[in-house]
Amino acid sequence: MKKQISFSQALATVIGSVIGAGVFFKIGSISQSTGSASATILVWLLAGVISICSGLTVSEIAAALNVNGAIEYLDYSYGNIWGFLFGWAEMTVYFPAQIAALASIFGQQFVVLAGLPASGSKWIAAGVVLLLFLINMLGTRASAWMQSVITVIKLIPLFLIIVFAIIRPQVSVSLWPVTVDSSGGWLAGISQGLLSALFAFEGWIVVTNLAKEMKNPKKDLARAIILGLSLVTVVYVLVNYAFMAVLPFDKIIGNDNTAYYASLKLFGQAGGKIVTVGILLSVYGACNGFMLTGMRTPYILAQANRLPGSEKLAKTSVRSGVPVFSALLINAIALIMISLGNFEILTDMLVFVMWTFTTLLSVAVILLRKREPDLARPFMTPAYPVIPLISIIGGLFIIVMTVINQFALSVIGLGITLLGLPVYYWKKLH
C-alpha cells in the first residue's frame, strides 16, 4: 500500500468515522443511569479517555502487522479461532445490531416528527434497512457518494444546537460536585452510563487500519487519534450540556426524544423540525456506513473459506461488485433484531461484545511486546504500559459491570458469539 495519508486526512477520518447518531439519542439512557447532570458529563469524559487510550494501544498492532483489520490482528496474536470469533461476532451481533439500532431510532424519531402512531416505527425501521440495501446494491460508488454528502450534513445540527443553547440557555446546569443518583449505587450508575456513551464513540477502531498507509505514522497517528477523539469528546460534552441547558433534567431522563424537544425549544416549531430532519439524515448516514462496511465481514471470512456456504457468500455482483449474499445475510439478521429488540438493548449488546474483543486487542499489545520484542513497530503506544493498562482496565470494568447489572443481555451477546465455536470446528473438519 502507498503511504499517502496525511495528518489532516487521518484527523478527518477519526472525526467522520466516530460522530454519528449516539450523541443525539444516548443522553436519555445515560441520565437515567447516573441521575445527575454532573455525572452525565463525567461519563462522556470517561468514555472519551477510554476510547483515546484504546485507539493509541490498538494502533501499535495495526502499524506493526502487515494484515487487514482486527480479525487478522487477533489471528496473529492469539490464533485463528480468536480472529474467527471476532469476525463471527461482527457478522452476527455488531453490524446487524448497529444497523437495526440506528434504523429503530430513525423509526422512533420519524413517527414523532410526522405525528404518526408509535406502532409504525418498526415498519419504518424495516423500510430504512431495505431502502439502504437497495442503494448499496447499486454499487459502492453510489453508497460512498451518499455517505460523503451526509457526513457534512450531520455536523450542521450539532453546530446549531451548541451555539444557540450557549447563547440562549434556559436552564441552570450544576456540574459540581459530581453526584450519582442510581438505585444500584455509584459504580452501577457510572458503568451503565459508560456502556451507553461508548456507543457514540464506536468507529474509532477503523482509524487504526490507516497506520500502514500514513506518510508518518510514528508522528501523526497518535496526534490524529488524540486530537480527533479529544475534539469528538468536546463536541459530545458541549451537545449534552446544550440539551441540559435547554430542557429540565427530569424531562431528559429516559427520553429518547431529547434532541427533538430541545430543537423545538431552541428554534421553534418550524426550525426545530428542520434541525430534526438534519439529525435523521445523520442517523440515516450512520446506518448506511455500517451497512457499507458490515456486508464485507462475511465476504472476507468467506474468501478465506472460513464459513459454511463460503462459495455463495464470497460471490460479488458482476455489475456492481457488491457481495450480494453477504449483504443479504447481514440485512436479514438486522431485520430480525428490529422485530425483537429496541435501540437501547441493541446498542448495549453490541458495545459489550465489541469491548470484549477490544480488550483482548489491548492485551495483545503487551503480549507481543514480550513475545516479539524485535518486531518492527513503526508506531509505538506512548506512555507504555500506562495507556494500554487504562484501556484494559476500562474494558474489563465495562465487561464485568455489564455481566453484573445486565446479566441476560451479556449472556445473549456472549452466547451468539460462542455459537461461532461449533461453526469454526465444523468448517475445520470439512
Residue ranges: model-predicted function:
Residues 1-38, 51-52, 56, 374, ...:
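Membrane-interface "cap" regions at the ends of multi-pass membrane proteins
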Residues 71-75, 79, 111-116, 226-288, ...:
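TM-loop-TM module centered on a large, flexible mid-protein loop between adjacent transmembrane helices
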Residues 313-321, 358-407:
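C-terminal membrane-solvent junction of multi-pass transporters and transport-like membrane proteins
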Residues 29, 52-129, 134-137, 280-300, ...:
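Hydrophobic transmembrane alpha-helices that form the core helical bundles
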